[in-house]
Amino acid sequence: MTIALGRIPKEENDLFDTMDDWLRRDRFVFVGWSGLLLFPCAYFALGGWFTGTTFVTSWYTHGLASSYLEGCNFLTAAVSTPANSLAHSLLLLWGPEAQGDFTRWCQLGGLWTFVALHGAFALIGFMLRQFELARSVQLRPYNAISFSGPIAVFVSVFLIYPLGQSGWFFAPSFGVAAIFRFILFFQGFHNWTLNPFHMMGVAGVLGAALLCAIHGATVENTLFEDGDGANTFRAFNPTQAEETYSMVTANRFWSQIFGVAFSNKRWLHFFMLFVPVTGLWMSAIGVVGLALNLRAYDFVSQEIRAAEDPEFETFYTKNILLNEGIRAWMAAQDQPHENLIFPEEVLPRGNAL
């Protein structure tokens, strides 16, 4: 006797199956369920940034010109943060601040919250896209896991840090020179370069660059001879079945150079993944600490001795004085509403910095 086993038939026009079939269809640009989050959010974030840098002034929030329309260029244009008085308002277009007036919304800095929030969800959507595609083609999800590093940095710097401070005002504005100014702010007010989490972040990013350069050069150096062409690129054949380069030769080379070398490709590539992602996560954790105003290293004994002994000075004490100068200049400029007035004798003078 034969028993036929099968699925219970579903309705012909099941909405979920119809959407799933369309979203995950094989096409030139994969959409997927993650695309429902990624594409609209990325479109709005980029569109908001291009609109802001082209047309919108920062006169009402920072007293600055920040658009191409006002004479800025690509390096100096920015979408600026809202004023400090607006604290952590989401600045919705229909909210009590703008009351549906688009021009007023732009003047208040509404484009910054618009770009920041849509940008954060776009990055999350991109990570989900990598998860979804990896599952579809039966890959491990390490690409998506690695992308959590940039997401952690973005969220910590643009969202968590200002949430810990008095308002969105203290987040970075979206522009090149604006980010540079934010870096100087971080140094002056938080002594960020002496923060151990920043040190781990720098080690991770620069270490990853070094590993990437070494790995790429080593692979190119140990390509198997598989033709009689005159250049390196003769081996770029998508149908090649055999191994591209000699791990044994590479291992012998670096063993002679350093005395130690990777002998396992899996460990080598995991290490190349681990170094930058860990560095980015450490940086993100450090920025969360700054949101709570946690201090970096303080070498108080050196500061006390430098204050008592005019002949004693270290690079650390010089940097502390430099930070004081940054604070004295930036606080009065960035926060005019606080009416901060410093006597002339405490302000740094020109090249004396």
Swiss-Prot record:
It is an enzyme of class 1 (oxidoreductase). A plastoquinone binds at H215, F262. The keyword Signal does not apply. Its EC number is 1.10.3.9. GO terms for molecular function: chlorophyll binding; electron transporter, transferring electrons within the cyclic electron transport pathway of photosynthesis activity; iron ion binding; oxygen evolving activity. The modification N-acetylthreonine is found at T2. The modification Phosphothreonine is found at T2. Keywords: Acetylation, Chlorophyll, Chloroplast, Chromophore, Electron transport, Iron, Magnesium, Membrane, Metal-binding, Oxidoreductase, Phosphoprotein, Photosynthesis, Photosystem II, Plastid, Thylakoid, Transmembrane, Transmembrane helix, Transport. PANTHER family: PHOTOSYSTEM II D2 PROTEIN (PTHR33149:SF12), PHOTOSYSTEM II PROTEIN D1 (PTHR33149). PSII is composed of 1 copy each of membrane proteins PsbA, PsbB, PsbC, PsbD, PsbE, PsbF, PsbH, PsbI, PsbJ, PsbK, PsbL, PsbM, PsbT, PsbX, PsbY, PsbZ, Psb30/Ycf12, at least 3 peripheral proteins of the oxygen-evolving complex and a large number of cofactors. It forms dimeric complexes. This is Photosystem II D2 protein. It comes from Secale cereale. The lineage of its organism: Eukaryota, Viridiplantae, Streptophyta, Embryophyta, Tracheophyta. The gene is psbD.
